[in-house]
C-alpha cells in the first residue's frame, strides 16, 4: 500500500483524509511543514494546509525535487487568490474545508495508480433509469 503525508492540516480535515486512506490500508503520516523533502520521496500523495505561508514554499520545493508528486492544498474556506496561487505553483488540486469524503475518494481513484489502491468489490444491485439514458 501507499504512504500519504498530511502536512500542517487542521484536526478535522486530517481525520477525514486519514479515515479514507486508512480504510484502504494506506499509511498516513502527519508532519509539520518544516521537514526534509527526502522524507516525501516514497509518498504516494501529499496533503498540505496551514495557510499559504506554510504550504507554498513546500509546494515549490516539492515541484523542483519531485515534479510528479500529487500535492493537494487544503485551505480553510474558499479564497480565490490562495486557490490561484496554489494552482499556479503546481498544486494537483485545492480543497476547502470541510473536506467531503467523496472528494478524497475521487482524488484517490483518479491520481493514485490502481496497484496502490484496494480493489473495489462493490456489486451494483439496483437498476437506475439514469443509467439507461
PLM features: what roles do these ranges have?
Residues 14, 34-66, 75-82:
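Conserved phosphotransfer microenvironments
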Residues 7-31:
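Two-component/phosphorelay signaling modules centered on CheY-like receiver
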